[in-house]
From Swiss-Prot:
Belongs to the polyribonucleotide nucleotidyltransferase family. It is found in: Cytoplasm. Residues 700-734, 744-766 have a biased composition (Basic and acidic residues). PROSITE patterns: KH_TYPE_1, S1. PANTHER family: POLYRIBONUCLEOTIDE NUCLEOTIDYLTRANSFERASE, POLYRIBONUCLEOTIDE NUCLEOTIDYLTRANSFERASE 1, MITOCHONDRIAL. This is Polyribonucleotide nucleotidyltransferase. Keywords: Cytoplasm, Magnesium, Metal-binding, Nucleotidyltransferase, RNA-binding, Transferase. It is an enzyme of class 2 (transferase). SMART domains: KH, S1. Residues 700-766 are annotated as: Disordered. Pfam families: KH_1, PNPase, RNase_PH, RNase_PH_C, S1.
């Protein structure tokens, strides 16, 4: 295949696709260039069907060379995917997965490799576009294309694929994907936006998606391959009819048992009895394994059909609830002692239960993120754990998987919108959600538990946040939207639409579906139903704890902040860290200073924090014109005296500014070590300070300022050295730097006295 290039302008950038040049042994491969972001996507398919599920794997690989950076760590090589890469892979997987045929079992891999990275041209958007297109032009059976975009909301306007600056100004961060007809994936964080604004964003995003799909269709028409014939998993129709006729009523009764564990036991007993009958019947048949495989699919299909029939026809849910009814709710705080942990919340919804624990720490404990973007500190972390005991099973136990990372990130987006600013609350914040029981919607339970933990821990959040999961049963013509779906409804339903927010608006959305897409009407109904449910949950949370506690837990670290000028950071740190180490040694605190000058001081002892803050304030303090100080005399010269205002800040009091009457000698007015009251009169551009004592003394009645003789012009040699360098500036700097070399300063001040106050001059007339 020869190289082909296709380009369009999309959302203010050039989108270019290249095919036929690289990765030609893959079933399909494309290079997508969006702005200066370049992503190579390759799609491959296994030769044979495997297993009883569809093994789709989507990867998003961030290569550090793409941003001109070295990987961190000892080995200087990319290792496990970053959290962002994992979330991006999930983001691409979710809209692609529903686009494969029922019964398709061949393994499919879609690998996205970021070759160059432009922070203002989304790698996620490019990779999702490339994933769909690589599958669409390949011989892999794929009912696409799909595409996705990012949407921002600024000043009442929706912006497609925003830049970094636009994202920072936006009250919405939305990823939306779909096919030409409908939306099939949503992921969003928002600053308490209304349902109407969110729906508008989804529709604006889908309109942009349609443009990308039309572009893909043009490319497929020119370079697409003929789709391969693959064997789909089909059950024996005669066997299916036989089993349904004989056992459907038994399975229906089992499915209608309301309590989860009892229902699971009942359905398991019915299925095992049926399998036992057919195992004996076909014991000697060489196709026994295929028969049993088909039988498992048939029984799963029967259960699937009964759950959906109950909901759509009888309007009865498996646990007996109404379509829009929430399971029983319970909320509790302080599950563990406040003397040890910083805040806990236990939230229960039916048979789903989550325990969230808050930990506060200074900002130097924040997570450092070093990816393709510039390195930064992540202040808020929400981690989600799903142990197998929560569903009464044994299984894998270890590092979090993609699902746990994804659910943690969803909770993080939902809650971070209501957190106080770093200036208001100078802590790094970590929430860990332990799912203790699960029967659906555990991610939303973790959000509710997180709200309880934050409020119990004294974090001054703007408002409590609650989350609810909505479901959908659709036959293509009619549909039913379900509130608070349980595990069975999630498993056999068509949609899992999670909505989190406050009473003011939505803070997070996530939608996954198993059908090709859903309409705006369904989305609007689901959002409205979710709002009603969210308010019910907030009632329970607020009845448990109405406002965040005013005091932190006794076990929480004490932190205070002081903002210092950026140019003073080096003063606080000192040469080689000498100054900051001295403060730490004296007070026993720990100190963290960010690039913006926010200085966080933390300790278990509040008095130590106060002392450290006092020292730092003194170090960065600056004199201001008009301020009055009690200053100590630190040096006396014939023309005046130097006084210490505070710290290392000195000021010069000229002899003429010591009194209204003529002062013959400085020593007549003050001596070393005296404390005198002075007023700041002038600060020059080099930071040198002139002060006055007489400005604080009432002018004598009838006082007349002495007449000053005009200055005589002197040869430059009197004021400059042989290189033309002005010695006066250097002289004064020598004093300010405590160098001890004041010879130039003396000459400067002596010359000043001679010219300005000839009556005080000791110089002989020329």
């Amino acid at each position: 295949m020869a190289k082909e290039t296709f380009s369009i302008e999309f959302a203010g950038r050039t989108l270019t696709v290249e095919t036929g040049q690289v990765a030609k042994q893959a079933n399909g491969a494309v290079v997508v260039r969006y702005g200066d972001t370049t992503v190579l996507t390759a799609a491959t398919m296994g030769k044979m069907a495997t297993g009883d599920f569809f093994p789709l794997q989507v990867n998003y690989e961030e290569k550090m060379y793409a941003a001109g950076k070295f990987p961190g760590g000892f080995n200087k090589r990319e290792a496990r995917p970053s959290t962002d890469a994992t979330l991006t892979a999930r983001l691409i997987d979710r809209p692609i997965r529903p686009m494969f045929a029922e019964g398709f079992r061949n393994e499919v891999q879609v690998i996205n490799t970021v070759l160059s990275y432009d922070e203002n041209a989304s790698g996620r958007v490019a990779a999702m576009f490339g994933s769909s297109l690589a599958l669409a032009i390949s011989d892999i059976p794929f009912d696409g294309p799909i595409a996705g975009v990012e949407v921002a909301y600024i000043d009442g306007k929706y912006i497609i694929n925003p830049t970094v600056a636009e994202k920072e100004a936006s009250s919405l961060e939305l990823s939306v994907a779909g096919n030409i007809n409908a939306i099939n994936m949503v992921e969003s964080g928002a600053k308490e936006l209304s349902e109407e604004v969110m729906l508008g964003a989804l529709l604006a995003g889908h309109n942009a998606v349609k443009e990308l799909i039309e572009f893909q269709n043009e490319i497929v028409a020119k370079v697409g391959k003929e789709k391969a014939e693959v064997e789909l998993l089909h059950v024996d129709e005669d066997l299916k009819a036989e089993v349904i006729a004989a056992y459907n009523s038994d399975l229906q009764k089992a499915v209608q048992v309301e309590e989860k564990l009892a229902r699971e036991a009942a359905t398991k007993a019915v299925k095992e009895a049926i399998i036992s009958v057919y195992s004996a019947k076909y014991e000697n048949d060489e196709n026994l394994s295929i028969i049993l495989r088909d039988l498992a699919e048939i029984l799963e299909g029967m259960e699937h059909a009964e759950v959906r029939r109950l909901i759509t026809e009888d309007k009865i849910r498996p646990d007996g609830r109404k379509i829009d009814e929430i399971r029983p709710l319970d909320a509790e705080i302080d599950f563990t002692p406040r003397s040890i942990t910083h805040g806990t919340g236990l939230f229960t919804r039916g048979q789903t239960q989550a325990l969230s624990t808050l930990t506060l720490a200074p900002m130097n404990e924040a997570q450092i993120i070093d990816g393709l973007n510039d390195e930064y500190k992540k202040r808020f972390m929400h981690h989600y754990n799903f142990p197998q005991y929560s569903v009464g099973e044994t299984g894998r136990y270890g590092a979090p998987g993609r699902r746990e990372i994804g659910h943690g990130a969803l909770g993080e987006r939902a809650l971070e919108q209501v957190l106080p600013s770093l200036e208001e609350f100078p802590y790094a914040i970590r929430l860990v959600a332990e799912v203790l029981e699960s029967n659906g919607s555990s991610s939303q339970a973790s959000i509710c538990a997180g709200t309880l933990a934050l409020m119990a821990g004294g974090v001054p959040i703007k408002a409590p946040v609650a989350g609810i999961a909505m479901g959908l049963i659709s036959d293509g013509t009619n549909y039913t939207v379900l509130t608070d779906i349980q595990g069975l409804e999630d498993h056999f339903g068509d949609m899992d639409f999670k909505v989190a927010g406050t009473r003011e608006g939505i803070t997070a959305l996530q939608m996954d579906i198993k059908i090709s897409g859903i309409t705006p009407e369904i989305l609007a109904e689901a959002l409205a139903q979710a709002k009603t449910a969210r308010f019910q949950i907030l009632d329970v949370i607020e009845a448990t704890i109405a406002q965040p506690r005013e005091e932190l837990a006794p076990s929480a670290p004490k932190i205070d902040t002081i903002t210092i000028p950026v140019d003073k950071i080096k003063v606080v740190i000192g040469k080689g860290g000498e100054q900051i180490d001295k403060i730490i040694a004296e007070t026993g605190v720990k100190i963290d200073i960010d690039d913006e000058g926010l200085c966080s001081i933390f300790s278990s002892d509040q008095s130590a924090i106060d002392r450290a803050k006092e020292i730092i304030a003194e170090l960065v303090r600056e004199a201001k014109v008009g301020e009055v100080y009690e200053a100590k005399v630190v040096r006396i010269e014939s023309f005046g005296a130097f006084v210490n205002l505070f710290g290392k800040q000195d000021a010069m009091v000229h002899i003429s500014e010591m009194a209204w009457a003529r002062t013959a000698k400085v020593e007549d007015v003050m001596k070393l070590g005296d404390v005198v009251k002075v007023k700041i009169m002038k600060i020059d551009d080099k930071g040198r300070v002139d002060a006055s004592m007489r400005a604080l003394i009432e002018k004598p009645e009838g006082y007349v300022e002495p007449e000053r003789k005009p200055r005589e012009r002197r040869d430059n040699k009197d004021r400059r050295n042989g290189n033309g360098f002005d010695r006066r500036n250097n002289d004064r700097n020598n004093h300010n730097n405590n160098s001890g070399n004041h010879s130039f300063e003396l000459r400067e001040r002596k010359s000043h006295v001679d010219h300005e106050f000839p009556e005080l001059s000791t110089k002989k007339p020329e």
